[in-house]
Structures are given as structure tokens and as C-alpha cells.
Amino acid sequence: MAAAVPQRAWTVEQLRSEQLPKKDIIKFLQEHGSDSFLAEHKLLGNIKNVAKTANKDHLVTAYNHLFETKRFKGTESISKVSEQVKNVKLNEDKPKETKSEETLDEGPPKYTKSVLKKGDKTNFPKKGDVVHCWYTGTLQDGTVFDTNIQTSAKKKKNAKPLSFKVGVGKVIRGWDEALLTMSKGEKARLEIEPEWAYGKKGQPDAKIPPNAKLTFEVELVDID
């Protein structure tokens, strides 16, 4: 027996309003969308985690798409659902061949940020500001490929943080985007997908392989 077709809960204006939390839209989609629909739109999993990676435009598009395609819960057979979910997973695992230059509808950010030490919550860098950072970069197996943090006392005394203009393409995009969300004094762990790191080519000189997901611990010590 087919499930009852849900009614639209919000108007377009309400969906785009800041008063409507992303979590409410995700909850609605998870309650009413079929598993394969949710998998295609990367909406499966813990609501809090999905809210971290999905932006509002992506959720609004998914909400409208759900009603256009009528792919509600209970409308697909189990075998079809598992096949589609499997296909989506396989496609996600393959390196993307689409043009990385395309900026329209990029979907959720290609990085996640975990705060290790809170900053002052008042001084945030803007595009074009010079930021000063200590950092350590590791591959998924834990290999450190780059750091400016010195361990010996002598080197530590002469060490200087990395300084660059943020948000203007001087560093990988994952850094540019993440640092704009950090406040002075904040230390965070950044897990950056290949698309916002070194992509399909990698960085052979730094021993970074193609399609590598990178992890950085970054401390924003100052902003000019």
C-alpha cells in the first residue's frame, strides 16, 4: 500500500527565509523522501551532520525536486532502492570527470571543520586580509606532508607562521573557504576533499597523490 502523498510544508519565500532552519527542511526530506532520492541528494545520515555540509540552496532545490518527481517514501521497491543507492555510492567513489571550473550549483562545501580551540569569536578575516597561520598537513594514512611547526627549541624561536592573502586563490580552496569562517586565535581540524585540495593531479613534489583527501590542523594566530 502506497504511503500518503505529503503536502508542501512551506512556500518558496519561507524556504529561503533565514527564519527556517536547515535542520527542519532536512527532517522533512528524510521523513518523506525515498532512500534513493535522499542518497542522490546526499541527505542520508544524521540530521546534524547533513546540516553541516548542505547549504540552503541545495536543500531548497532538493525540496522542490521531491515534489516534482514525487519520489516519496514507499513509492519504490526495495530492490530498486538498494540498486540506486549502490549506484550513487559507486559514482561517489569514482573521481569526478566533470569540469571543476563550473561554479553553478556546486552543492555543499568540499570540506569539514572541527574546532579544536575556540578563537575570540569577534575578529574574522575578510577576503584580501593577510592571515598568519601555524599548520600541519597529513594524508589519510597519517603521513605528515607539510608543517611549519618546529619541534626543536632553537628552530621554534626563529619560526614564523605562514602569511598570505586569504580568499583570493593564493592557497587551496579548502583553506581559503575555511579560514574565512575562523576567528583570531582559533585552531581547527580541516578535512578537505580532493576537489578543494589538489584534485586529480595531486602534488607530486609534496608527495600528495591524485584525488587525495587532506587533513590540516590550522591555527589562525593573527589577521592584518
Curated annotation (Swiss-Prot):
GO cellular component: nucleus
Annotated positions of the N-acetylalanine modification: 2
Matching InterPro entries: FKBP3 (IPR043368), FKBP3_BTHB (IPR041200), PPIase_dom_sf (IPR046357), PPIase_FKBP_dom (IPR001179)
Sequence positions bearing N6-acetyllysine: 99, 170
Location of the region described as Disordered in the Swiss-Prot/TrEMBL record: 89-111
Superkingdom of the organism of origin: Eukaryota
Gene3D superfamilies: 1.10.720.80, 3.10.50.40
Activity regulation description: Inhibited preferentially by rapamycin over FK506.
Basic and acidic residues: compositionally biased ranges: 89-102
EC number: 5.2.1.8
Similarity section: Belongs to the FKBP-type PPIase family.
Job description of the protein: FK506- and rapamycin-binding proteins (FKBPs) constitute a family of receptors for the two immunosuppressants which inhibit T-cell proliferation by arresting two distinct cytoplasmic signal transmission pathways. PPIases accelerate the folding of proteins.
Stated name of the protein: Peptidyl-prolyl cis-trans isomerase FKBP3
Organism: Homo sapiens (Human)
Organism phylogeny: Eukaryota, Metazoa, Chordata, Craniata, Vertebrata
